[in-house]
Amino acid sequence: YINFTTNSSTIYIRLKVKGAQAMAQMPATGVSGVDLYAKGPLGSWSWTKATVNFKDTITYKFENIHDPALFEYFRLYLPLCNAVSWLEIGVPENFTCTLLPAQNEKPIVAYGTSIMHGAYASRPGLGWTNILGRKLNSKMINLGFSGNGQLEPAMIDLVNEIDAKLYILDCMPNLWDKTKFSAEEIEKRMRHAEAEIHKKHPGVPIIFTEHCSGKDGINLDTVMAQKYIAVSQISAAVFKKMKKEGIKNIYQLTAKDINFDTESTLDGTHPNDIGMIQYANAYYHLIRNKIGLSQ
């Protein structure tokens, strides 16, 4: 995202993206669009509607913004899936627009799958990491990789290069295939991740997350549901052993905590907007009330 200030009640965005603007299962507004929020002086966030045109150059026009000077700053979220070739932010003549530097604070680092990447929210501000960042007023680094969030040692090494205040490891949605990932392999990867992160960042909390769709009652495809439930059970068993061994500063977000139901996903796996809100709320509750991290 990009933070900026302006005294204009009209804001123009122009951008071009590198890939297809939409997917069969995800609208152009989520795949290739942007999203504008404004942060108030007391920490509250307001969303801003836009007039949108998806052509070769994508345009957004935000207008009639009530007294922009009242807001601490604006936050423009970038596309959830597409790479941006170029982007312009504009305001009418005689108004100002000032880009703000990156937040100078330790981030929350989240490593995971396409779900973390934002699939399948309808617009960028509704990806769960973006919702959580607003709720916690915290800098977030999203390391979501479609089909490739698998807790590989090489990826943990890269995650470990970032000095974070919290690490979220949400990879079970890419580890459910037992023909590729045995229970023993999942345990090996979870233990390696904990050991390596705490070796370099002692005392920093780590969250291990179950498969968000790993509970009964989400969809009628019970064959797939049982695979998701099974990998959640493996994750829970490993976490329980680690806690019993006295490993500290590790936490678990369960599928029950996330609490998906029949309205939460687009395809039985990836959350829709409802599921994204449930996901973010579950993380927020764990981080604020159990870990005690406020900002």
Regions found by a protein language model. Give the residues of each.
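A generic structural signal for short coil/turn motifs at secondary-structure boundaries
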Residues: A22-A24, H117-Y120, W176-K180, I218
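Alpha-helical cap/lid subdomain in secreted, periplasmic
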Residues: P153-Q295
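N-terminal secretory targeting modules
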Residues: Y1-P107, Y284, R288-Q295
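A structural signal for short, well-ordered beta-strand segments and their strand-loop junctions
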Residues: I13, I141-L143, F208
